[in-house]
Amino acid sequence: MQRDRAGGVGRAAINQAPLRRRTFDPRLRPFDLAANLVTTLRRSRAIPPDHLLRHVFETARDYADAKHILQATPVARPVIYTLVGCRPDERCIIERTEVGERTRCDDLVAANDWLDRLPHWEGRIVATKILTSTFEEAIENSRLRCEGLVQWRGSFALDSFGWLQPSVLNACTRIAVEMCPAHSILRAVGYELAAGRDLPDPVTLPCRLTLDRMVA
């Protein structure tokens, strides 16, 4: 998402936040999921996180305004926002609970867990492992993906999608996207998991869009 090149809001992404746990038995994860859903439906009248992000890009004046709205507005459920502006110092990750927030402007990677571990929160896992993965395995899943991004030393200009390696690339990957708001560039490529394969393969050619093409 982008408003304009000079002083625009920039671009953003959403990651699913960790799971609030009341139990620590893998077999009881469905109970925690259901309990969280009931709590949200019965008690929360706040805006859903994805609706808030859309509101930001429709109304925010600039990056600073967008950042403040994402930090301060109560949300219906926890979420992790990545926000990047059009200037070199405009970048942050905002970890949100329903009314709380933690913003960092370094360690700019995110998966599906808080950067700093908190009691009674568990990194998200794929649905097929919901009854079997241990608490430690759930933590490791997000940690490895973050480490894969941190260790990449490539270039946006020269190494398009070079960062998409295991564990960032995983069985659930279906689309990969690169965005540069400063130059109004968006790239995307689609993936599919073939029968008998552990990891998906690209099934589309990389698509590159610029602001001029998107407006046209």
Language model feature labels by segment:
Residues 1-216:
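C-terminal, well-structured catalytic/ligand-binding subdomain of enzymes
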